[in-house]
UniProtKB/Swiss-Prot annotation:
Keywords, in A-Z order: 4Fe-4S, Amino-acid biosynthesis, Branched-chain amino acid biosynthesis, Iron, Iron-sulfur, Leucine biosynthesis, Lyase, Metal-binding
Database matches in InterPro entries: 3-IsopropMal_deHydase_lsu, Acnase/IPM_dHydase_lsu_aba_1/3, Acoase/IPM_deHydtase_lsu_aba, Aconitase_4Fe-4S_BS, Aconitase_4Fe-4S_dom, IPM_dehydratase_rel_enz, IPMI_cat
Subunit structure: Heterodimer of LeuC and LeuD.
NCBIfam families per record: leuC (TIGR00170), PRK05478.1 (NF004016), PRK12466.1 (NF009116)
Pfam families tied to this protein: Aconitase
Protein name: 3-isopropylmalate dehydratase large subunit
Record family assignment: Belongs to the aconitase/IPM isomerase family. LeuC type 1 subfamily.
PANTHER family xref list: 3-ISOPROPYLMALATE DEHYDRATASE, HOMOACONITASE, MITOCHONDRIAL-RELATED
Length: 473
């Protein structure tokens, strides 16, 4: 086994097998980090309670309040700041469960509070070679560090809480090779949207994707997190990028990163986490990164996307009957006509936020476009940092004032308008340009229409009132 060439995913998987599966059964994997939030955990804790079990490794479990929290009016973190009764109950329940089971919790008002997929990396909890799980599909974000990170269901959350293990069958492996160098106006969000448009929302089904190549190696850690975050939108179980000096520089000095001799030993191990030269992937996809331009979605799934310079496709462009029917339904829901230039689509609300694109680099990129400009009449812009730490850093850099001066709303940290589960929602028929990850029907509010975009495109769109890129200003 040790002499067989392995992919990155296979190496991490191998190092976490507690008990190998027999006769095609699942392997039992050890879980290094379990992230918890208020929405998918209540029933899991109830299951523990009913069975008389404790949390096996509370030291490897961390909880945050993110999905249901408001982004306006949060001052102390008191439960009464949550107006919606169900949301307030879920947050209250998480606080009670964390206290009862001895789990570290970052609540509203806590300096470390934020979206769980930002909090893990910024604290240095997410590290190369780990297995990371959370009851949230965008756990794949953490794969940017060279970890196997995946979303799990509530019953699996209970299993990990009780045993710190998870039974899983090995997944297929896919390499997405991105050659060349991205153009200055092209971001990792444009790249991942282009990839999903190419392979489809089911293209990665049953696979762990490893993003490789020159364009990937030149991405910052935050840009890599955006890539891995949206792996699930291509149908993949997880996404990974091999750790390198960019990874090590990001982690060094963070609160939970190894220190001293432990750091040196960790880096030596992390350097081994690369796909062997002769390792075989089940699927390989090639992308020319240098040929990409800003990319946006027009439909109701992340695979229905096009370069910003293009127009809504003609129905006859779809040779597959299912794709054509899906496109027809998407155009009807989105109230769009074939042949309409994407730049002609008027936008009511611009949302800069979510675990995909509201880290400090994203806020800087949008602020660079907005500086000295104003949000168009008839358009509103909401800016929601992904964590309290990100918010504080942005304010130290004066980014908040750039947004406020432009006429945008500067909010506190949370998942916000990414999903219709808190007060930040679209009205029926309202159209958004959003830096989030899903454009499903009703995702941002019943009847809301969502176009997925990068932070620079979001900012340019806010200024013009229609889909636009910085080059259009």
């Amino acid at each position: 086994m040790t002499n067989q060439p392995l992919t990155l995913a296979e190496k991490v998987w191998r190092d976490h097998i507690v008990a190998a599966g027999e006769n095609g059964g699942p392997d039992l994997l050890y879980i290094d980090l379990h992230l918890v939030h208020e929405v998918t955990s209540p029933q899991a804790f109830d299951g523990l309670r009913q069975a008389g079990r404790k949390v096996r490794r509370p030291d490897l479990t961390i909880a945050t309040e993110d999905h249901n929290v408001p982004t306006i009016g949060v001052k102390t973190g008191d439960l009464q700041e949550i107006q919606e009764p169900t949301s307030r109950l879920q947050v209250s329940t998480l606080r009670d469960n964390a206290k009862e089971f001895g789990i570290r919790l970052h609540s509203m008002g806590d300096i470390e509070q934020g979206i769980v997929h930002t909090v893990g990396p910024q604290l240095g909890l997410t590290q190369p070679g780990m297995t990371v799980v959370c009851g949230d599909s965008h756990t794949s974000t953490h794969g940017a560090f060279g970890s196997i990170a995946m979303g799990i269901g509530t019953s699996e959350v209970e299993h990990v809480l009780a045993t710190q293990t998870l039974p899983l069958k090995p997944f297929k492996t896919m390499a997405i090779e991105v050659s060349g160098e991205l153009q200055p106006d092209v971001t990792s969000k444009d790249l991942i949207l282009a990839i999903i448009a190419k392979i489809g929302t089911g293209g990665g089904q049953g696979h762990i994707i490893e993003y490789r190549g020159e364009a990937i190696e030149k991405l910052s850690m935050e840009a890599r997190m955006t890539m891995c975050n949206m792996s699930i939108e291509a149908g993949a179980r997880a996404g990974m990028i091999a750790p390198d000096q960019v990874t090590f520089d990001y982690l060094e000095g963070r609160p939970h990163a190894p220190k001293g001799a432990d750091w040196d030993a960790a880096v030596e191990y992390w350097k081994s986490l690369r796909t062997d030269d002769d390792a075989q992937f089940d699927t390989v996809v090639h992308i020319d990164g240098s040929a990409l331009t800003p990319f946006v979605t027009w439909g109701t799934n992340p695979g229905q996307g096009l370069p910003l310079a293009e127009a809504i496709p003609q129905l006859e462009d779809f040779t597959n009957d299912n794709d054509r029917l899906a496109a027809e339904r998407a155009m009807e829901y989105m109230d769009l006509q074939p042949g309409t230039p994407l730049r002609d689509i008027k936008i009511d609300t611009v949302f800069l936020g979510s675990c995909t694109n509201s880290r400090i680099e994203d806020l800087r990129a949008a602020a660079d476009v907005l500086k000295g400009r104003t949000v168009a009449d008839g358009t509103r812009m909401i800016v929601v940092p992904s964590s309290t730490r990100v918010k504080m850093q942005a304010e130290e850099e004066g980014l908040d004032q750039i947004f406020i001066d432009a006429g945008a709303e500067w909010r506190t940290a949370g998942c916000s308008m990414c999903l219709g589960m808190n007060p930040d929602q679209l009205a029926p028929g309202e159209r958004s340009a959003s830096t989030s990850n899903r454009n499903f029907e009703g995702r941002q509010g019943k009847g809301g229409r969502t176009h997925l975009v990068s932070p620079p495109v979001a900012a340019a769109t806010a200024v013009t009132g229609h889909l636009a890129g910085p080059a259009d200003l």
